UniProtKB/Swiss-Prot annotation:
InterPro entries: Aldolase_TIM, DeoC, DeoC/FbaB/LacD_aldolase, DeoC_typeII. GO terms for molecular function: deoxyribose-phosphate aldolase activity. The gene is deoC. It comes from the Bacteria. It comes from Escherichia coli (strain SMS-3-5 / SECEC). This is Deoxyribose-phosphate aldolase.
Amino acid sequence: MTDLKASSLRALKLMDLTTLNDDDTDEKVIALCHQAKTPVGNTAAICIYPRFIPIARKTLKEQGTPEIRIATVTNFPHGNDDIEIALAETRAAIAYGADEVDVVFPYRALMAGNEQVGFDLVKACKEACAAANVLLKVIIETGELKDEALIRKASEISIKAGADFIKTSTGKVAVNATPESARIMMEVIRDMGVEKTVGFKPAGGVRTAEDAQKYLSIADELFGADWADARHYRFGASSLLASLLKALGHGDGKSASSY
């Protein structure tokens, strides 16, 4: 197996196969569930809006893949600093049956100098998730923070407040995941000594098998080749799947989605 094939198989099994579009429908989510079951293995999860969780759960069970996890998003994509709303949305997502919640950090508040509200928001959402055995991923929106010091600070605050994963981006802004921001965030995980309990998720803009290989190589460099498993590493993507399958000898590499 070539290096690209090997990394593509790894990446496929680490994907949070995503649809977060305004025109999502039950039919599109059902199709996403079908795509998550591939000839070479399943994606780790799907990521959808909360209202589609029940139909996704039913579809995954019916197709014989109940182990594919269901992730959803809250405080999304705006990252406002209203803790009560973020918490209410997170509780609602849990009630819908989410296995994982990706909450947007109040990044604009941090840019304006307020570190406390981010900590408090993540902590509140973490307490709700922990009580239900739900994983919490925190989206810090690196492409808007831009500054390395702010990316580090948002990562540190999220981890201290209980994040199970730190995630680069919503996929809804001009600049999403980049290898540079990925390295900064994973270095924070390393420097804080939390690599056993905290994972990393690049999202938005990871579109090709070569992109995925590049991101995995950073993780391997920092933590060794065994770290990037489904508990410690995810790719938030949709169009990536077709490219990975093509690299693995399945399909033509074309995708209908741009995430």
